């Protein structure tokens, strides 16, 4: 085995952390990064509003045993709003999901996964002003899988 591969296997994670950091994280960047490197929880984005928890389970369980799935909800309507959290029992299973599921298609949408520092109650709700995700507030195009036009475009 090459030295680089051995080093990668011994590291906290050889699935790279993205540049994204949760702006609402309570703590400093160093603490958040430390949690991200140990986390077994993934954020899953760009889901259709119609994707079910069962579909998430079916896809993500191919990478390992799932401890919990938390569907993202519109904080006003309590309906799905295009994201979820998937928590695995082991870091290795979460890494497999990052490696093999990120960028795949589910419900005709390319989904993206990212490390999450760990689910906390309240994070299942969208952070946009209208209750959904912020990105859906400003979207100008029509997207049937995400509720039609963005909220601002609907109000024009």
Swiss-Prot record:
Omega-N-methylarginine found at: 146
Outcome of substituting residue 20 to A: Abolishes mRNA cap-binding
GO CC annotation: ciliary basal body; cytoplasm; cytosol; nuclear cap binding complex; nucleoplasm; nucleus; RNA cap binding complex
Region (Disordered): 124-156
Effect of substituting residue 114 to A: Does not affect mRNA cap-binding
Outcome after substituting residue 83 to A: Abolishes mRNA cap-binding
Subcellular location: Nucleus; Cytoplasm
Keywords: Acetylation, Cytoplasm, Methylation, mRNA processing, mRNA splicing, mRNA transport, Nonsense-mediated mRNA decay, Nucleus, Phosphoprotein, RNA-binding, RNA-mediated gene silencing, Translation regulation, Transport
Domain RRM as annotated: residue spans: 40-118
Function: Component of the cap-binding complex (CBC), which binds co-transcriptionally to the 5' cap of pre-mRNAs and is involved in various processes such as pre-mRNA splicing, translation regulation, nonsense-mediated mRNA decay, RNA-mediated gene silencing (RNAi) by microRNAs (miRNAs) and mRNA export. The CBC complex is involved in mRNA export from the nucleus via its interaction with ALYREF/THOC4/ALY, leading to the recruitment of the mRNA export machinery to the 5' end of mRNA and to mRNA export in a 5' to 3' direction through the nuclear pore.
Subunit text: Component of the nuclear cap-binding complex (CBC), a heterodimer composed of NCBP1/CBP80 and NCBP2/CBP20 that interacts with m7GpppG-capped RNA. Found in a U snRNA export complex with PHAX/RNUXA, NCBP1/CBP80, NCBP2/CBP20, RAN, XPO1 and m7G-capped RNA. Interacts with PHAX/RNUXA, EIF4G1, HNRNPF, HNRNPH1 and ALYREF/THOC4/ALY. Interacts with SRRT/ARS2 and KPNA3.
Family: Belongs to the RRM NCBP2 family.
Protein name, entry field: Nuclear cap-binding protein subunit 2
Organism: Homo sapiens
């Amino acid at each position: 085995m090459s030295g680089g591969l051995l080093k990668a296997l011994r590291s906290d994670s050889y699935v790279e952390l993205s540049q994204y950091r949760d702006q609402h994280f309570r703590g400093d960047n160093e603490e958040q990064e430390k949690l991200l490197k140990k986390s077994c929880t993934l954020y899953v984005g760009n889901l259709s509003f119609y994707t079910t928890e069962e579909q998430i389970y079916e896809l993500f369980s191919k990478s390992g045993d799932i401890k919990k799935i938390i569907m993202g909800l519109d904080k006003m309507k309590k309906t799905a709003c295009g994201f979820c959290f998937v928590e695995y029992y082991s870091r290795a299973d979460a890494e497999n999901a990052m490696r093999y599921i990120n960028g795949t298609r589910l419900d005709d949408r390319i989904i993206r996964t990212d490390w999450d520092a760990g689910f906390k109650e309240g994070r299942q709700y969208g952070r946009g002003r209208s209750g959904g995700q912020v990105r859906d507030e400003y979207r100008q195009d029509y997207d049937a899988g995400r509720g039609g036009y963005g909220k601002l475009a609907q109000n024009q």
